[in-house]
Amino acid sequence: MTAITDIIAREILDSRGNPTVEVDVYLEDGSLGRAAVPSGASTGAHEAVELRDGGKRYHGKGVEKAVEAVNTEIFDAIGGMDAENQIQIDDIMIELDGTPNKSRIGANAILGVSLAVAKAAAQSANLPLYRYVGGAHARLLPVPMMNIINGGAHADNPIDFQEFMILPIGAETFRDAVRIGSEIFHVLKKELASQGHNTNVGDEGGFAPGLSSAPAALDFIMKSIEKAGYKPGEEVALGLDCASTEFFKDGKYVLEGEGRTLEPGAMAEYLAELAAKYPIVSIEDGMAEDDWEGWKALTDLIGKKTQLVGDDLFVTNSARLRDGIRMGVANSILVKVNQIGTLTETLDAVETAHKANYTAVMSHRSGETEDSTIADLAVATNCGQIKTGSLSRSDRLAKYNQLIRIEEGLGPQAKYAGSSILRG
């Protein structure tokens, strides 16, 4: 009944108007699983590779080759297989590709199939995806890390750091957390407008004002939290995504917006100063992806009390994560399904993190779709945190709305992670 009878891939558009892959998987009993693949702007050098067509069409960003690979090679390899055999199906696709980074068939092709297979199997079992993947113990609703001011590669402004986030740790429920985030978002919009800043939004729905420094952005957010009627640090904490690889040049951190260049040790000290001055509980990619010494310095400095998330550092890859664990580097992994390219490898990365007492943060990409799979995966893995953008743009809100539905479906079983995510 759960045998795969057909796989149909197509080229659709993501939230930036760029092509991406969508896959439908049909089963013998009529079940359908559909998944659309996200795409990043600031990508780690060690990520699995998206297959793009090149040429003039869509400025080289077309995905017809990846679509063709799904409709022919991948279908020939897994057609007829039982959709419940997720690990075996993912392994076959990895072997079929035959490269260490999925560059022949494309991680975008493989991931689309991997997620659609799981969704089809869940529908066949008459289970929500989070329950099918996570089992009976999947009930923890994540703290949303809401990216309300954008800089770096996500915005056209002088701010060096890529994301400034609010975390409603004092909320009672996920539904409350979304409300708190929304209220602060709208206060921030008024605050920015009153100071003459534009309130256009970036790729992830956050504002991209012409501020020149991290402290300036943090000050605006602190003021907005208080004006919305909440206590910074107690009810709402702050998070940063520095995306430091983007401004790491010749062994130094070049903060153009702030007009200074820092050695790795000084960069770690600067982040420690910010974490001491503001209620910052999480810093992502505080150091560059291959600056392992800088990462070690930062971890030694503030790792006991601040969540230090490896995104470009670990790229959702269990092998790189194990290296980091062995070296005592960072204490958390950002989980992006398209960085590694299959559901099986994604779940393995979360499990590896949890076994080492590292936290895991489920995450979107800057190029998203209306697909809300990561909302289910956040609950399935009980990871307790999700990054899926700001409180605007339907590609971001699709995930928040799905989590509201999941919380409602769980009823009294649902538990909001809240302040349990804090270190120290």
Swiss-Prot record:
HAMAP family: Enolase. Keywords: Cytoplasm, Glycolysis, Lyase, Magnesium, Metal-binding, Secreted. It comes from the Bacteria. Pathway: Carbohydrate degradation; glycolysis; pyruvate from D-glyceraldehyde 3-phosphate: step 4/5. The gene is eno. Belongs to the enolase family. One of its GO terms (cellular component) is phosphopyruvate hydratase complex. It catalyses: (2R)-2-phosphoglycerate = phosphoenolpyruvate + H2O. Disulfide bonds: none annotated. (2R)-2-phosphoglycerate binds at residues 162, 336, 365-366, 387. PANTHER family: ENOLASE. Catalyzes the reversible conversion of 2-phosphoglycerate (2-PG) into phosphoenolpyruvate (PEP). It is essential for the degradation of carbohydrates via glycolysis. Gene3D superfamilies: Enolase-like C-terminal domain (3.20.20.120), Enolase-like, N-terminal domain (3.30.390.10). Its EC number is 4.2.1.11. Mg(2+) binds at residues 241, 284, 311. Its cofactor is Mg(2+). NCBIfam families: eno (TIGR01060). This is Enolase. InterPro entries: Enolase, Enolase-like_C_sf, Enolase-like_N, Enolase_C, Enolase_CS, Enolase_N. It is found in: Cytoplasm; Secreted; Cell surface. The keyword Transferase does not apply. One of its GO terms (biological process) is glycolytic process. Binds a second Mg(2+) ion via substrate during catalysis. It comes from Rhizobium rhizogenes (strain K84 / ATCC BAA-868).
